[in-house]
Amino acid sequence: TSPNINGFWVMLENDEQIEFPIKPLIDHARPTFRQIMSRFSDLAEAYIEKRNFERAYMPRYGLQRNLTDMSLRRYAFDFYEMTSKAPARA
């Protein structure tokens, strides 16, 4: 995952909205956040495919790395877990 994570997790408690920084969660996660997210690799692929039914979509991770081959867009996220279904180029 990106070392530049600087967002917030927003929680509603009673009627008060509370923000917590995400960076400490990422820095101290055991197992690592990448290991946790790799469990959702199939779900991320399915989401990307769903978005592509609506219109052409390349995830931000692919755009930031100048990935121009749209056939590889379903593998364009940083916690992708290689499987036997994936092409060698992925």
UniProtKB/Swiss-Prot annotation:
Q: Cross-referenced InterPro entries, in alphabetical order?
A: Poty_coat
A UniProt-annotated Pfam family: Poty_coat
Presence of the UniProt keyword Kinase in the record: no
Q: What is this protein called?
A: Genome polyprotein
Asked if Acyltransferase is a keyword of the record, the answer is: no
Gene Ontology CC terms, in alphabetical order: viral capsid
Family (UniProt)? Belongs to the potyviridae genome polyprotein family.
- According to its UniProt record, how is this protein modified after translation? Genome polyprotein of potyviruses undergoes post-translational proteolytic processing by the main proteinase NIa-pro resulting in the production of at least ten individual proteins. The P1 proteinase and the HC-pro cleave only their respective C-termini autocatalytically. 6K1 is essential for proper proteolytic separation of P3 from CI.
Entry keyword set? Capsid protein, Virion
